[in-house]
């Protein structure tokens, strides 16, 4: 029971619903892979204790025991091969160099494997999600940036071969985006996207700026895991469903039928609306999808508070100072401030494919490292 509590606590180092600044940002000193596996360090001590209780591991964690043994063998092989670097035979030294490179690569892979085995996944990692984007500080420039970020995530969903369905879309007069939401579904969609929530800041010269000055604008991303039917049951008696005429773009359909749907969850006051589709039935279905995600996210936050007495995760004021990532167009770079990682070629990054995926993978790895450090510190 104790181990379950410890492992559960480690999960919350990074919030399930990353809709604002991280509860505590990943420090620049978050341990890299080699630091975690330093001989004599807490992780090594932990692994040695685990390997020392083979009978227990054979029953409970056979896969972990196998990887620990393989890591020890590979490290022993590396040490033995390194001695050959001082051999008088040049051909033997070159052969040793090649063997060392291959061995180091295998050791790195084994260490990553151990981290994945030690850090438990969240129950929501396999869930689909609701993406919400909202323009923040910066007027029309913020709305233009919001539109670009929404497009970036739509392209990322295509890159990952996920399903992407727009639920809401409220454009601005000049081609920007005030607010939009979408349902994203696919293999480990929430696991990949959960660290995208927060305030995104852009620094660039707006198209309307005649003096060439760099402006700073912001927008907010919210990521909400979608519940399954088992996760959340809603009593129909707790809902008030209103219909109204749609407004905004839509041609002759606008203001002619009561297709827009507004659903209120009476016990909590949570509201969900949708007027994206021409069909009232379809809009009701989409509004319910959003409502379920919001209620499920509230439930998860309550669980966090019960376990850790943590403050609620909030979107915040969308101010310029609350940021998880900066997109600097004059310098052609994007920087994630939680892990102090900078990538160049911003144009490619905004296309939502391999560069964004690289940053997502880095965030996942650092989150796993911090969770592992928390687990080890409480178990050693």
Curated annotation (Swiss-Prot):
InterPro entries: PCRF, Pep_chain_release_fac_I, Pep_chain_release_fac_I_sf, Prokaryotic/Mito_RF. Expressed in skeletal muscle (at protein level). Methylation of glutamine in the GGQ triplet by HEMK1 is conserved from bacteria to mammals. It comes from Homo sapiens. One of its GO terms (cellular component) is mitochondrion. The GGQ domain interacts with the peptidyltransferase center (PTC) of the large ribosomal subunit to trigger nascent chain hydrolysis. It is found in: Mitochondrion. Residues 236-300 are annotated as: GGQ domain. Residues 63-117 form a coiled coil. A motif (GGQ) lies at residues 250-252. Residues 1-26 form a transit peptide. The lineage of its organism: Eukaryota, Metazoa, Chordata, Craniata, Vertebrata. One of its GO terms (biological process) is mitochondrial translational termination. It comes from the Eukaryota. Belongs to the prokaryotic/mitochondrial release factor family. SUPFAM superfamilies: Release factor (SSF75620). Keywords: Coiled coil, Methylation, Mitochondrion, Protein biosynthesis, Transit peptide. This is Peptide chain release factor 1-like, mitochondrial. The modification N5-methylglutamine is found at residue 252.
């Amino acid at each position: 029971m104790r181990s379950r509590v410890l492992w559960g606590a480690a999960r919350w180092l990074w919030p399930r619903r990353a809709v604002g600044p991280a509860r505590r940002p990943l420090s620049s000193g978050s341990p890299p892979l080699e630091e975690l596996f330093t001989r004599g360090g807490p992780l090594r001590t932990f692994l040695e204790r685990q390997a020392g209780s083979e009978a227990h591991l054979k029953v409970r964690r056979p896969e972990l025991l196998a990887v620990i043994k393989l890591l020890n063998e590979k490290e022993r092989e590396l040490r033995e091969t390194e001695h050959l670097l001082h051999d008088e035979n040049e051909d033997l030294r070159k052969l040793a160099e090649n063997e060392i490179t291959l061995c180091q690569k295998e050791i790195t892979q084994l260490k990553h494997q151990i981290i994945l085995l030690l850090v438990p996944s969240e129950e929501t990692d396999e869930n689909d999600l609701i993406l919400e984007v909202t323009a923040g500080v910066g007027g029309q420039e913020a709305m233009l940036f919001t539109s670009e970020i929404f497009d970036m995530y739509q392209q990322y969903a295509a890159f990952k071969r996920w399903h992407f369905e727009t639920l809401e879309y409220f454009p601005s007069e000049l081609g920007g985006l005030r607010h939009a939401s979408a349902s994203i579904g696919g293999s480990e969609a929430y696991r990949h996207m959960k660290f995208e929530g927060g305030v995104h800041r852009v620094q660039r010269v707006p198209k309307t700026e005649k003096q060439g000055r760099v402006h700073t604008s912001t927008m907010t991303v919210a990521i909400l895991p979608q519940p399954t039917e088992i996760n959340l049951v809603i009593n129909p008696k707790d809902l008030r469903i209103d219909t109204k005429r749609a407004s905004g773009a839509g041609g002759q359909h606008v203001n002619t039928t009561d297709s827009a749907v507004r659903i209120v969850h009476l016990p909590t006051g949570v509201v969900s609306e949708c007027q994206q589709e021409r069909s009232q039935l379809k809009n009701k279905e989409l509004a319910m999808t959003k409502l379920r995600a919001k209620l499920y996210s509230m439930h998860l936050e309550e669980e966090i508070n019960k376990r850790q007495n943590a403050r609620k995760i909030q979107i915040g004021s969308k101010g310029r100072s609350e940021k998880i990532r900066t997109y600097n167009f004059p310098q052609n770079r994007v920087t994630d401030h939680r892990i102090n990682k900078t990538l160049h070629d911003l144009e490619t990054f905004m296309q939502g494919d391999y560069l964004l995926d690289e940053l997502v993978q880095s965030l996942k790895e650092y989150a796993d490292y911090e969770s592992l450090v928390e687990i080890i510190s409480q178990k050693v």
